[in-house]
Amino acid sequence: MDATVLVEPQQVDALLGGLAGHGIVPRSPESRSIATQHRVLLLWHERSSMPLDLVLGGAGIEEEFCARARIHDLGGAKIPVISAEDLIAAKILAGRPKDLEDVRAILHVNRKSLDFELVERTLRRFEQALDRSDLLASLSQLSSQWP
C-alpha cells in the first residue's frame, strides 16, 4: 500500500513513534536514512505483514493533491483519498508498467467524469519542472485506447 502524508523532516521520528504504536514499523534499519534521502518511509504492518510505502509529502504539488483529495468513509474512519485526476498524473510520472496499467484501469472506469484539463495541467507542470516532454504524450496514448 502507498500513502502520502504531509510532514516536515523534523517530524519523522514523531511519526515513526506514533505508527509503531499501531504495529507499523520500519522494514529495515536503513528506513530512516532512506526517508531522509528519498522522502519515502519503507514500513511494515506487523499483524497483517502488509508493506506500506509512506511518501513524505511537502510543499508544492503534494500539498495540492492533498487539498483536492476526497474524503471517504471506510468503516467509520474518514480517509482522504487522492482524486482520480491526480492519481493518473502521479502514475504517469512514475511510469512503471504497473502504474500505466493502473492508469488504463482508472481511465476505463472514470473516463466520463474525469477532468482531463486538470490532468494535462498537472502533467505539463511536471514536464516543465523535470525538463521532460513525454508525460502528455503518455496520457494521449493511454487515453486513445478508450473511446
Give, region by region, the residue ranges found by the protein language model.
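Compositionally biased terminal segments of proteins
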Residues: 1-147
